[in-house]
């Protein structure tokens, strides 16, 4: 499996660094005919009489009981649970030439109220508290019943990953912005690959084929309203939508859509948020595109909240894609350091606020021509990322996305930071650290934090990148996709993960993506397995 890990990482790396060429191709391509295309940003959903009903193919080339589209956290979780619920023949389709999607390059942090690391430290937490945090951060746009179902599934899902999949976590607990308490666990290698790798092995054990380079061209919904299968292209070569051999696959029970978001699709994301031009990089792998968002809408799936698109506030402009600098900016500087505007030498945001607040603050300063940096000293680094993600600092320094300075004066000179103002900012942090009181921006001092002042000093430049789509297909708490015209579940169609909306609202809290995908994938898989065969 070491060879598999290396090949997948090499594949993702090569895709990320050829992104400009790929996206130029995507920008020239028309995903669908003009009759099916969502023409403007105001068309968030199709109208009732626009929901397509498709003629059945003359013959089906093959059949399965359940077809799962997407091989990330959500898709593999859905497939496993469906198979274990005696669904019969379950298959997973992946359009790219390696499995995992964004899940492979995920940071491996998983929000779990009541996890063993919390219990060991005496941290009191509950599904209700996590739900409250999510609803507050999401500005009330999250659907309470969906959030409740997901948060109650958090600890059982964590235990499932450990006991059934064999996923390994370290013994640390972390806190992302917007969470009331530290509650996320870290995978042993600090990457979502630890989970995907174990999910793939589990799928193989269960006899679930994960078929690569299979592009879903059409979701086939019959005149009776039921989804009955897919038109696909086998042997697809990303991003050429006309490549591959057309085949029809019958889904006797259900199709489960786990195709993820569209962060890498500049044209489509600009329909929903015109500000997110190609000037914004994305943390997503290039396959995070819009074709199944468009297709699910075409057949009557209700798209909700698609204009809520999250930018990661902690990324660096000195590397492509997700990169590694964020683990310093968030893991060290946001928790036990400071973020400053280099033009003023002052903090400009609560470093533990939710991602939208922080990203908006960085972008506002960037638009003024100001550089913003995340800053921490040696003590902060030793207390945080050196423990939670061993060896990550070496990688960050090697890639020159985190920068090391012997003295604070050297750092200030490099970034033209007014030294007096910077020293005053650090003194203010140290005052609140000594008193144990929140600062003027509302940041609570992280438990165990020490005063800042022990060189050498480290920093990374901040530049938000498109990260996560909070909107998507409307589903109920069982994972059933809701029809735009009837407000009832579309028979035979389920969805989970980033392809769905109503879970996070306006803002997704960090570490809740893994929870969302795994928990809701499992829920959708179990429910889909209960469907009766239509033929």
Name each region found by the language model.
Residues 17, 21-39:
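N-terminal secretory signal peptides and thylakoid transit peptides that target proteins
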Residues 34, 89, 95-209, 213-218, ...:
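Conserved N-terminal/central alpha/beta ligand/cofactor-binding core
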Residues 60, 79-81, 247, 385, ...:
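C-terminal structured subdomain/cap of oxidoreductase catalytic cores
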Residues 66-91:
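N-terminal Rossmann-like FAD-binding beta1-loop-alpha1 element of flavoenzymes
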Residues 221-248:
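Conserved beta-strand-loop-beta-strand element in the redox core of flavoprotein oxidoreductases
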Residues 237-244, 250-319, 514-523, 527:
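Glycine-rich loop(s) and the adjacent beta-strand/alpha-helix scaffold that form part
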Residues 421-507:
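A glycine-rich dinucleotide-binding beta-alpha-beta segment and adjacent secondary-structure elements
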